[in-house]
Amino acid sequence: MEGALTARDKVGVQDFVLLDAYTSESAFVDNLRKRFSENLIYTYIGTLLVSVNPYQELGIYTVSQMELYQGVNFFELPPHVYAIADNAYRMMCAELNNHFILISGESGAGKTEASKKILEYFAVTCPMTQSLQIARDRLLFSNPVLEAFGNARTLRNDNSSRFGKYMDIQFDFQGIPVGGHIISYLIEKSRVVYQNEGERNFHIFYQLLAGGEEERLSYLGLERDPQLYKYLSQGHCAKESSISDKNDWKTVSNAFSVIDFTEADLENLFGIIASVLHLGNIGFEEDDQGCATIPDTHEIKWIAKLLGVHPSVLLEALTHRKIEAKTEEVICPLTLELSVYARDAMAKAVYGRTFTWLVNKINSSLVNKVGQRILDPLLLLTWKTVIGLLDIYGFEVFDKNGFEQFCINYCNEKLQQLLIERTLKAEQAEYEMEGIEWEPIKYFNNKIICDLVEERHKGIISILDEECIRPGPATDLSFLEKLEEKVGKHAHFETRKLAGPKGRKRIGWMEFRLLHYAGEVTYCTKGFLEKNNDLLYRHLKEVLCKSKNIILRECFLLAELENRRRPPTVGTQFKNSLSSLLETLISKEPSYIRCIKPNDRKEPSKFDDFLIRHQIKYLGLMEHLRVRRAGFAYRRKYEHFLQRYKSLCPDTWPHWHGPPAEGVERLIKYIGYKPEEYKLGKTKIFIRFPRTLFATEDAFEFSKHQLVARIQATYKRCLGRREYVKKRQAAIKLEAHWRGALARKAIQRRKWAVRIIRKFIKGFISRNKPLCPDNEEFIVFVRKNYILNLRYHLPKTVLDKSWLRPPGILENASDLLRKMCVRNLVQKYCRGITAERKAMMQQKVVTSEIFRGRKDGYTESLNQPFVNSRIDEGDINPKVLQLISHEKIQYGVPVIKYDRKGFKARQRQLILTQKAAYVVELAKIKQKIEYSALKGVSTSNLSDGILVIHVSPEDSKQKGDAVLQCGHVFEAVTKLVMLVKKENIVNVVQGSLQFFISPGKEGTIVFDTGLEEQVYKNKNGQLTVVSVRRKS
């Protein structure tokens, strides 16, 4: 327990309502400091979120954090901006009403970042469909574009919003984001042409120069150095280390592609941006008559090209003014000062209206284009709810405050008034009206300041408008004098003339001071009339209306030139816009985020007590805390409360027929509310603690599941019974029909079977008779059956002689089919033979013609395939190859040569070429026998391998016949015969053969059979060859 208390004391309390000294401002600040020092930047005041800008990344905005807060009761987890977003979303879905989240605070307090985090939370956690993915992405990516064109670096904030933005996120009845709409307020156009020291122009200018492609910049006539442009260099901080313009350009470029900007849109848009920079670089000189001239028209040409106007027309419009006098037009030259004013007015008008066009373009891409969803055949449910996000400029106090700060601070006064009306004042008034005991809490009501600014005919804006339109020379000084005359007695207004001796030293002669709810602000009236009028000379309007730039043509319509009525002033437009905004916000349920800036230097971990106390005071946080401590967190009319939670009590469910107040009393008694947790008013129930409401809501969620389960069970039982009865009746009827159909089908089948059997018997009896009606079907059946059976018994090879025996009537057809089948098998076999195999078979045919039935061993040789050669070319001596290189070797085989004298066996190679046969001994050719000199080839009828090549005895070149023994005698003889191309040269002898040894001398080879093969010289000097007898 002590450890828990120590931890709590270290990091403070996460809800200021739990502070013991809740009336002490010091305790309030001390709690903020403790949490800030531990990087706990969020703290609650009831359901209001206080956020302190950490000026650093804390890593608390991950997807896992979003999922952690999704669907969780508000106070179950530590304070977070995601909790505010989730609570607004769940309340919207549960009650089907509209909500808004008001984010307020000084400039630099983190309002824009809070707005982005809420938008990211909705994008990630809301249910999403593929078709609505585009709408979600466009909502997200609209932010970088608007920040680029509407935000700038100021002395207090590197990303200060210089316009007000209200975004409505539209959800359908399922809670899916389907679209959105953005309203912008009072873009600070004067920043386009002038920036204070240490400040920058709008981000887009620097991003374009830093990250734009070389081709784009060349087309726009721009250089990368921002110091070259007057409109970008006045604050002397064009390049800031804390801002990465190049990376931001990539983000903006990607966003443009997501939110449906075409290349033509971007070309026109950046043409306008570049033309503003070129405008700022136009230099004027004064001629002898005191009129303005432009000596260097280089920038004029670029502007004319980018805006699609004629250079001479633009030049004239910047140095002359067109004045209409009844039916005549007079063009008067401008002085140097007025030409500079015209140039700056044109730059501001072009940028301001382009920004408005940009917002409208984004809105057109955010329009909900999803079709209606049909939940019921008789109901089209198109209900849509919205959550609004208000990210508007914070209260600003600079060393020099002008018209823009006046409008911004007036806006903050109105928002403070809204908060007072919706919280402090309205809540206390409600307690009094409902008869709830209450101790009134004092607070400052800033309505008196709002009236000072906006009251009709009497307020500062009305006085400013009068001064702008009155005839005669109206000046900023005359406006200040008019203020002193009409509102000089107001307690919150002061000028140097009206102030006391001490106050005069701090107010200049052209200044006035307003005592705002946030403190005193001194405004310089210089430029008030000019900025309120926002005058653009008619001559310049005509030029812009005729521009070929599509965006400018939409921004400057020709109808403006025809309208002679004076347009409303900037102040009046802003006042009307604020009134419209407040009407929108009042119609929605609010959530509040109060942003606090911890220091003026944008330094992390630095906590400025004085600055924070000032913000706590003017944000009214102490008053809000006191109201929350003393008040009630939730109130609802009896009818609504009973209607929502009646299912929690058996007495009120499903219908309560008595007065709603009694029903609510019965309901809370059953639930178990303690007396200190609630009060019953005249028309409403008030619940003091959020935890009481959340417990009730949890019970309601559980009850809903039970009710749904019960309703589902009853409905399913009813549907099931109805379906069962329906199916049972259908099954009985189907069964009856099916049985009848089966019976009819069985009878028909039996009749059919009788007819078939009768025909079969008749056909069988008369099967041998000529074709007639009695046997026609039988014979067709027999034919068909035979053909069908035959296909499963066809021979697979040519050698397969089997054939299915046919019936007598099909013998002729069977013979024809058999011949066709054999022919088909032969063709199939022949098509499958390769060229190499075909050549081998041809050789086998020659072998058959020579040896079949004439020599033993022929039958065994049939299964031995012939080869191209039995000797590889590498086995032949290179010298031999060189000797016969002029001839191609066709065949080679190892042989044994027997000497003609003595019959000694010697290993040799027999090589056959195209022209001759060679008997080779290693590197020497022993005998060459040309085919032309070949007389014959002899071999025995036995299985020996003796081969005798006969030559002519008269041939002096030959030594005699060659007696060889070869292991592949069939192959060798066949190859030799095919090369000689004479089959009749082979002589298969029986018993013995004579061969030529030398001129006039012959030898004899005797062939015999025995138990084993042998070759030897017998006693008679003959060569005896013994073979084992085989079947031929």
Swiss-Prot record:
Report domain TH1 positions: 855-1029
Q: What biological processes does GO assign it?
A: actin filament organization; actin filament-based movement; endocytosis
Q: Where does ATP bind?
A: 105-112
**GO MF assignments:** actin filament binding; ATP binding; microfilament motor activity
Please state every residue range assigned to the domain named IQ.
704-726, 727-756
Q: What does this protein do?
A: Myosins are actin-based motor molecules with ATPase activity. Unconventional myosins serve in intracellular movements. Their highly divergent tails are presumed to bind to membranous compartments, which would be moved relative to actin filaments.
Q: What is this protein called?
A: Unconventional myosin-Ih
Q: Which organism is it from?
A: Homo sapiens
